[in-house]
Amino acid sequence: MNKITSSNQYFFNFKRDLNASLDNFYFSKKNEILKNELGLFINDSNAHNLFISGDKGLGKTFLLNCALNHKKFSEQKCLYIDIENLSNNVKVFNEIDSFSVICIDNIHCSNKDIEVELFNLVNKAFTSKTKLLISSQLHITQLNLFPDLLSRIKQMSCFSIEQISDDEVDDVIDFMNTKLKLFFSKELI
């Protein structure tokens, strides 16, 4: 593990966006509930753990990084693990139950050994104050995981991130124009 911006934040060196912010994510109308739940996850110490599913490229990894980057967690021990890049290294799960927030990305890529370790981690999180945010390209009903692990994940608040609709494309362009300070005129867009 590598130290990052504070003595309390760690990550495994792959796919970690240290600048991700919820302010820079366009939440379509269909994703407003997810936006609200992420806000609760970050701001409410009693909030449920979250499972987010959705197709590749919809922003799941970005949202996990947004949560970890939030100022609310800046003084807490946080961890991001991308299962897709983990291979069979189950040793990474030793002593990670001391973290306040753990984001697990691409759980659909796990193998049986990792699933057993994830099951143990989820159990520890459920009995402690550790917050979990888990993502997958597969919907909860499509996951083929160790049954006990799947059962624990189903106890989490589960959401699917939805594709932006065609009628929201102009809003997305306006959003990006503002966020990136491009200042394109309406006529150009």
Regions found by a protein language model. Give the residues of each.
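A short, basic N-terminal segment
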Residues: 1-45
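Walker A/P-loop nucleotide-binding motif
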Residues: 46-64
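A short hydrophobic beta-strand->loop->alpha-helix junction that borders the nucleotide-binding pocket
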Residues: 53-54, 79-88
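Post-Walker A helix-loop "phosphate-sensing" segment adjacent to the P-loop in P-loop NTPases
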Residues: 69-81
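Conserved P-loop NTPase "ATPase switch" module shared by AAA+ and STAND
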Residues: 83, 94-121, 128-139
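Short regulatory helix/loop adjacent to the ATP-binding pocket of P-loop NTPases
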Residues: 140-154
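Conserved AAA+ ATPase "SRH/arginine-finger" region at the nucleotide-binding site
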Residues: 142, 156-169
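Short conserved motifs of the RecA-like P-loop NTPase core
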Residues: 169-172, 184-189
